[in-house]
């Protein structure tokens, strides 16, 4: 129904990863303890990949904040309510399936500058700042991130192991991303009002205006502690489950 964040239903077999997969569209989420790959393509939207390694369960969401002109620090705004709702749906489903909030680790992606003409700042920047701030205030540690920039991204997440691989795409290669996200911004008022009404009822909003951001350094930053960077389609050498692979399309 339109007031709920729907579970992704596009199931397939992924020949590249040699396992069952799920493709997530905007405003969808999926959680599993199975040996699967969750795949999505992001423009200015963001995806949070959250895992409980002890329970062997994880999930992903894919969402965009409605562009109501509000700053990400305004917790009572409609867009912040919807963002909090999108995150809480994922977190609550993981808890229902046996995950423990105190063990959750997050990897966050997207927020690219692929949409123009928004009312305030670039919508990708707003989405990125929101997901960082939300997770910091929820005390869920971000162990890897690849946010902002000018590229769409293809993200593949293996919830059982926590492994993530990211491919940065040229916008012309994924022309449908911008069109799809423009359509999201033009959603009719009734559908948006229903989602926001559900968010107001079901989500307790964060309100701390100055919490410190828990974030890791970006992959391109030369620092010893950053996550290792590997190619999306690289050979199967062992990696730590906290690492994310990434590459840019030439």
UniProtKB/Swiss-Prot annotation:
Hydrolase as UniProt keyword: yes
Family annotation (SUPFAM superfamilies): CNF1/YfiH-like putative cysteine hydrolases (SSF64438)
Presence of the UniProt keyword Hydrolase in the record: yes
GO biological process: chemotaxis
Keyword terms, alphabetized: Chemotaxis, Hydrolase
InterPro entries, per database record: CheD-like_sf, Chemorcpt_Glu_NH3ase_CheD, Cytotoxic_necrot_fac-like_cat
Any one GO molecular-function label of the UniProt entry: protein-glutamine glutaminase activity
Catalytic activity: L-glutaminyl-[protein] + H2O = L-glutamyl-[protein] + NH4(+)
Pfam families with a match to the protein in the record: CheD
Leader peptide range in chain numbering: none
Enzyme class: hydrolase
Family: Belongs to the CheD family.
Function, in words: Probably deamidates glutamine residues to glutamate on methyl-accepting chemotaxis receptors (MCPs), playing an important role in chemotaxis.
NCBIfam families registered for this protein in UniProt: PRK13487.1, PRK13489.1
Full protein name: Probable chemoreceptor glutamine deamidase CheD
Lineage: Bacteria, Pseudomonadati, Pseudomonadota, Betaproteobacteria, Burkholderiales
